[in-house]
């Protein structure tokens, strides 16, 4: 029997940038629908919608399904000048697949349809009131953004919203009900989770709704997943009704790992975060949260990641930490070569929760967007740390790193970010990739690997190998 590939984080190739992932299981495969960033992009969501899928029993083997919907398919965007923002998909009463989305410059929700999960979607129509007025264009409507959809029987629940600080015209995430035609509103929008301007003194204060509405159902409970006012969190709320009565549940994941105290202080960010968007999905017996991370020191080159979660008997979900092995079902093999772009922790001796600092390490790639080159960690300066979690270490006696750059100094190897140094790897000035090896002793068991640079200059880290 062929060995299955290990499942890595990010789960797609390092040259692919699919944020805002909405995961679904159809016919034994996991499909992820998201927006499409570019490497070195200058705005969000510059690409057409593409889809990737994987067998539910082999989450390391992702297949590119191709472009499922080009931006100029929408009649309002024939010249392709507007971007396709984060979409969602639902199966309608007729068994077809309906793709809901918003264009970046319009306040409305568009819908496309396809007979298969990842075929060629065709424009279908716009969500509208019974008089034909498009949702978002009636007096008093809030602009539509980040649709989340759930179909039950002959009706579909549509959740949308965006709430920035200081804008009282945006109330929160709002839900309306669509008829079996998937377009016509039969119950008008109502706010279910407040934005920051309406959260003071409520259970939502500090974690009010910002964007990224997503809805799932587990047993008899509806889970509303959303990005909170601090942006880097994906939070959840629960209700026994899709139409309201939601109560704040907690944070599921933060893309800077804030609040996690299992390996660091809770208030220490361990990655460079920004906005976040994703949802939960059951794959086999397990549940996962899909989210995205930022790369290239930019808001506009985001990549999908996932972590295993546990929905407890009382319906609650504890926050999970960022790892390099999210879909793997356990730690990665503790021997072999691993690319540096798998770093789930990136920080310096001055940690920051948000991207953008000139001195921050960042995941990068050579070439232009679409070039199928493995990523690496670049802009590594003094005190920069890259962390990788987790590995099942067995009888490892040496570590090799592959690095380049005009820098001199050493990489320190640890199994805890603040633990003892287990090996040092001196590097030299070079503009080509060079290997550096050192002996190391690591106790057998499950460990992280942390690589910290101490020295002068700026270097890149391509990979490390455990032997």
Region spans (language model):
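Carbohydrate-active catalytic/glycan-binding domains of CAZyme proteins
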Residues: 1-424, 428-467
């Amino acid at each position: 029997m062929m060995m299955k590939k290990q499942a890595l984080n990010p789960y797609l190739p390092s040259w692919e940038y699919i944020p805002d992932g909405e995961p679904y299981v159809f016919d034994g495969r996991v499909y992820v629908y998201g927006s499409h960033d570019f490497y070195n992009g200058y705005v969000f969501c510059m690409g057409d919608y593409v889809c990737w899928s994987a067998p539910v029993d082999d989450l390391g083997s992702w297949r590119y399904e191709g472009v499922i919907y080009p931006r100029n398919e929408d009649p309002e965007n024939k010249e392709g000048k507007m971007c396709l923002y984060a979409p969602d998909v639902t199966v309608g009463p007729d068994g077809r697949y309906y793709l809901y989305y918003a264009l970046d410059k319009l306040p409305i929700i568009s819908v496309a349809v396809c007979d298969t999960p990842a075929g060629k979607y065709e424009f279908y129509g716009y969500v509208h009131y019974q008089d034909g007025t498009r949702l978002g264009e009636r007096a008093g409507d809030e602009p539509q953004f980040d649709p989340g959809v759930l179909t039950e029987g002959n009706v579909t629940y549509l959740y949308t919203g965006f709430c920035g600080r200081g804008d009282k015209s945006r109330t929160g995430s709002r839900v309306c009900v669509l008829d079996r035609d998937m377009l016509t509103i039969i119950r008008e929008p109502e706010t279910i989770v407040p934005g920051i301007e309406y959260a003071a003194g409520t259970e939502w204060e500090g974690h009010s709704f910002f964007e990224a509405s997503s809805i799932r159902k587990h047993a008899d409970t509806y889970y509303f997943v959303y990005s909170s006012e601090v942006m880097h969190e994906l939070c959840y709320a629960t209700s026994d009704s899709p139409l309201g009565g939601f109560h704040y549940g907690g944070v599921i994941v933060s893309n800077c790992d804030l609040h996690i105290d299992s390996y660091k202080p809770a208030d220490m960010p361990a990655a460079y975060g920004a906005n976040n968007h994703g949802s939960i999905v059951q794959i086999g017996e397990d549940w996962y949260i899909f989210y995205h991370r930022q790369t290239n020191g930019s808001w506009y080159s985001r990549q999908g990641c996932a972590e295993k979660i546990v929905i407890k008997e009382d319906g609650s979900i504890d926050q999970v930490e960022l790892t390099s092995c999210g879909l793997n079902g356990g730690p990665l093999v503790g021997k072999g070569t691993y690319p540096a772009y798998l770093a789930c922790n990136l920080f310096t001796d001055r940690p920051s929760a948000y991207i953008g600092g000139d001195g921050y390490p960042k995941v990068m790639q050579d070439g232009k967007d679409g070039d199928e080159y493995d990523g690496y960690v670049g802009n590594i300066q003094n005190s920069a740390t890259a962390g990788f979690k987790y590995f099942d270490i067995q009888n490892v006696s040496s570590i090799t790193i592959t690095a380049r750059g005009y820098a001199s100094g050493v990489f320190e190897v640890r199994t805890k970010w603040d633990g003892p140094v287990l090996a040092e790897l001196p590097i030299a000035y070079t503009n080509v990739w060079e290997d550096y090896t050192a002996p190391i002793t690591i106790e057998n068991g499950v460990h992280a690997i942390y690589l910290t640079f101490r020295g002068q200059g700026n270097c890149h880290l391509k990979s490390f190998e455990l032997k």
